[in-house]
Swiss-Prot record:
It comes from Clostridium perfringens (strain 13 / Type A). Keywords: Ribonucleoprotein, Ribosomal protein. One of its GO terms (biological process) is translation. SUPFAM superfamilies: Ribosomal protein L29 (L29p) (SSF46561). Belongs to the universal ribosomal protein uL29 family. Signal peptide: none annotated. It comes from the Bacteria. It holds the Pfam family Ribosomal_L29. This is Large ribosomal subunit protein uL29. GO terms for molecular function: structural constituent of ribosome. The gene is rpmC. HAMAP family: Ribosomal_uL29.
Length: 69
């Protein structure tokens, strides 16, 4: 995910972030399935998706902590 995309995610609402997180988790599931069956063309995509999931989870957690303060 590029820096510009991260800035856009930080300004989006939590419902959009949760939806995007669900989409990425589904994509990761499909990529792992393709890897197991030997059909995955770009194994680096798994790493990219996992990193994007972590970034979105971090943004969601930052918002939760900001609300508590």
């Amino acid at each position: 995910m590029k820096a510009r995309e991260l800035k856009e995610l930080r300004t989006s609402n939590p419902q959009d972030l949760i939806k995007k997180l669900g989409d990425l988790k589904a994509e990761l599931f499909n990529l792992r399935f393709q890897l197991a069956t030997g059909q995955l063309e770009n194994p680096m995509r798994i790493r990219e998706v996992k990193k994007s999931i972590a970034q979105i989870k971090t943004i969601i957690r930052e918002e939760e902590l900001k609300i508590e303060q």
